């Protein structure tokens, strides 16, 4: 789970890139921020999944670089038995589940225990690669159809 650095350490010139929510989430990969901190508190390493834990709950992205994450994000680092792209696609299917488990009156949020207690299907690594290949093939076809409309 993220932890926001001291507000005095936030700047737009130097330090570790800082993200506190999904505002710079791309379709799949995190976009560059112009906010930095010279006192990072919680780091997400390259090739980690970023999960929004505050409204909107359950949105997923991948960071390709080290960043500092605030309280609105959770970083998940797949191990060697988990294909990053498979984990990304699998986690996106849980958004409505995370939303249904969120609590809060001002804005919805999920806790670390909700994430830790979630059960994910984990096929063998080679099957994960086959699943990702098929998903990307289908998405490419959908993109082509959409472009032709």
Walk through the language-model features, giving the residues of each.
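Low-complexity, Lys/Gly-biased intrinsically disordered segments
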Residues: 1-26, 39
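Flexible loop/turn segments at secondary-structure boundaries
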Residues: 3, 26-28, 58-60, 140
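Extended, charge-rich, solvent-exposed interface segments
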Residues: 106
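Amphipathic alpha-helical coiled-coil/heptad-repeat segments
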Residues: 97, 114-149
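A short beta-sheet element
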Residues: 20-22, 30-92, 102, 111
């Amino acid at each position: 789970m993220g932890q926001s650095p001291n507000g005095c350490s936030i700047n737009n010139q130097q330090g570790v890139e800082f993200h506190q929510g999904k505002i710079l989430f791309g379709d799949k990969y995190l976009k560059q921020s112009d906010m930095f901190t010279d006192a990072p508190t919680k780091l997400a390493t390259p090739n980690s999944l970023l999960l929004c834990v505050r409204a909107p709950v359950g949105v997923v992205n991948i960071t390709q670089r080290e960043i500092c994450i605030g309280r609105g994000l959770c970083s998940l680092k797949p191990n060697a038995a988990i294909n990053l792209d498979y984990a990304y696609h699998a986690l996106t299917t849980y958004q409505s589940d995370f939303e249904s488990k969120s609590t809060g009156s001002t804005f919805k949020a999920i806790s670390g225990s909700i994430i830790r207690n979630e059960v994910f299907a984990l096929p063998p690594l080679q099957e994960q690669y086959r699943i990702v290949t098929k998903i990307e093939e289908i998405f490419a076809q959908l993109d082509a159809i959409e472009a032709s409309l």
